[in-house]
């Protein structure tokens, strides 16, 4: 069982890391603006539930192995960078076609959940929280607490970013405005990749 102080610390980290800009939030905002909140819900749930599942698994099994393997770290770093740049390109080139129905469909829940495993920010969050909050005397309980807190933080932040994008979608109803917004979201992802590679 976590102490109230430890739980408060975990919650602060979870909410701060889930609400700050990153690939998931940029993709959710872009999807909300392009497809609307209702069509973005599967994507939203994939992110909100996919990361906590990942965090529990990392907390129980993978965190220590990942911390010890430079090859795994570099593989994720560069593989994740390439994939995130591809995602940024797809968002940037989606332009303003979403309202006309010719844009690609929003992500499905299982696709958004799978994306967490190649998202560098997700790995940093999962390993960091595992290192700080998984206790050797109660690893399963600790990992489940981490997962539970991230479910709450993830649902609220994913909903906030997708709803924000959907609200902006009304303003972005013209193809030129939507294209500009999608390019801005793509630029946020690309800048995050540059920051990740520089760090």
Language model features: what each stretch is:
Residues 2-74, 128-146:
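Juxtamembrane transmembrane-helix termini in multi-pass membrane transport proteins
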Residues 5-6, 194-199:
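Juxtamembrane boundary at the C-terminal end of a transmembrane helix
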Residues 15, 19, 52-53, 89, ...:
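Hydrophobic/aromatic residues within the transmembrane alpha-helices of Major Facilitator Superfamily
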Residues 38-108, 164, 171, 194:
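Membrane helix-loop-helix hairpins that form the core translocation module of multi-pass transporters
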Residues 163-187:
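Interfacial loop-to-transmembrane junctions
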């Amino acid at each position: 069982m976590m102490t109230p102080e430890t739980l408060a610390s975990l919650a602060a980290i979870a909410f701060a890391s889930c609400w700050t800009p990153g690939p998931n939030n940029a993709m959710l905002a872009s999807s909300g603006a392009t497809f609307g909140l209702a069509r973005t819900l599967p994507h939203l749930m994939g992110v909100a539930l996919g990361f906590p599942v990942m965090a529990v698994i990392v907390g129980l099994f993978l965190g220590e192995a990942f911390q010890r393997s430079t090859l795994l770290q570099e593989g994720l770093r560069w593989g994740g960078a390439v994939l995130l740049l591809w995602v940024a390109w797809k968002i940037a080139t989606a332009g303003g076609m979403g309202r006309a129905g010719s844009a690609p469909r929003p992500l499905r829940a299982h696709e958004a959940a799978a994306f967490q495993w190649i998202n560098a920010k997700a790995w940093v969050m999962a390993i960091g929280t595992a290192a700080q909050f998984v206790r050797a005397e109660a690893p399963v309980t600790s990992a489940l607490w981490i997962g539970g807190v991230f479910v709450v933080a993830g649902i609220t932040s994913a909903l906030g970013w997708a709803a924000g994008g959907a609200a902006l979608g009304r303003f972005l109803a013209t193809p030129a405005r939507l294209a500009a917004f999608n390019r801005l979201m793509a630029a946020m992802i690309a800048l995050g990749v540059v920051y990740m590679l520089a760090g």
